[in-house]
């Protein structure tokens, strides 16, 4: 039987529209269920009951190094108009040492809500990093 071990976070891929794009960081792969509190006046207990409510998904943030002449983030953000938005499905895969996906997050109907350029500093010695924040309508996890 193969030994089970925790997966490292540094080996992953991100794809949208069939294109694989390199990112240095992904965050916000969060899903939660809201709790609904309810109490009927005839309940013998003096407390409310709780039931599951609507699912809620946090925005996903993707960060990568700035590449000259690559304006993909800003171009996608600029396509948003009133009642018109270009939505994309995004696939994030955590890979094993053979570069095969072992966990896959599928983000449905994503669109950009924020694009942030790099922080510029005259005394800095880092790579320029840009980020895009995506709102979406669902998060699906596949764990092979």
Q: What are these language model-derived features?
A:
Residues 1-144:
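Glycine-rich, low-complexity intrinsically disordered segments
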């Amino acid at each position: 039987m193969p030994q089970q071990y925790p997966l490292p976070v540094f080996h992953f891929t991100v794809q949208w529209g069939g294109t694989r794009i390199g990112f240095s960081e992904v965050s916000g792969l969060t899903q939660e269920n809201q709790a609904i509190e309810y109490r009927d006046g005839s309940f013998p207990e003096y407390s409310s009951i709780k039931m599951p409510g609507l699912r809620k998904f946090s925005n996903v943030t993707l960060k990568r190094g700035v590449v000259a002449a690559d304006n993909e983030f800003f171009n996608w953000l600029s396509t948003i108009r009133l009642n018109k938005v270009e939505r994309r499905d995004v696939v994030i895969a955590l890979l094993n040492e053979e570069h095969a996906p072992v966990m896959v997050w599928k983000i449905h109907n994503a669109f950009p809500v924020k694009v942030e350029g790099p922080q510029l500093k005259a005394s800095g010695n880092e790579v320029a990093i840009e980020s895009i924040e995506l709102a979406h309508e669902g998060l699906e996890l596949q764990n092979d």
